[in-house]
Design a protein with these regions (language model features):
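The feature marks non-catalytic terminal segments
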Residues: 166-173
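A structural signal for short, hydrophobic/glycine-enriched beta-strand patches
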Residues: 1-152, 161
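Acidic, metal-coordinating catalytic segment for phosphate/diphosphate chemistry
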Residues: 158
């Protein structure tokens, strides 16, 4: 019950999905257990025309998610990635460096429910207009695993807030 409440509080701060289109879908890595779900959500959004491109961010995860997207029928020319980032802040900064020069501003951001609030605020800080889109946790995810994610996000939000990583920047990375 405590984990569910903690997660509901994090998700309750998010704007609902408006169904609007975006310039790109941005998929954040977050470990091997969450790759398949994120790839499936990104492929679904792309196939329904929500955005013309998919960008994957994350050192360990992006190569695997890119393969899953290709295997799921997304042509390579609509895919791009960076595999240097190791934190949410680096995800946002490196994504901004690569996408904003291409005039990509409005993004559909894909991550898990617990991570979304910090990711949304961090990407907004880098100048993106963000449409949050949640990827579900795998069914086999246990309550203790989910509790770790939720606790980690509360600590991450506190850390980013105290370090000034959630306040608006002037523009870009």
């Amino acid at each position: 019950p405590t984990v569910a409440l903690g997660n509901r509080i994090l998700v309750g701060q998010l704007p609902p999905d408006s169904g609007a289109s975006a310039d790109a879908i941005v998929v954040l890595g977050r470990g091997k257990d969450l790759r398949k779900s994120r790839a499936e959500v990104a492929a679904k959004l792309w196939k329904t025309g929500r955005a013309p491109k998919i960008f994957v961010s994350g050192r360990e995860d992006s190569p695997v998610i890119m393969k899953l997207l290709t295997a799921g029928g997304i042509p390579q020319q609509y895919l791009n990635s960076e595999n240097c980032s190791q934190t949410t802040e680096e995800n946002a900064r490196f994504t901004a460096i690569l996408l904003q020069p291409k005039r990509i501003q409005r993004i559909l951001l894909i991550t898990d429910p617990a991570h979304m609030l910090r990711a949304l605020l961090t990407f907004q800080r880098m100048g993106f207009t963000v449409i949050p889109y949640l990827s579900p946790l795998p069914l086999e995810y246990t309550a203790p695993k989910e509790a770790v994610l939720v606790f980690r996000e509360y600590m991450g939000l506190a850390n980013y807030s105290l370090a000034g990583r959630l306040s608006r920047q002037e523009k870009g990375p």
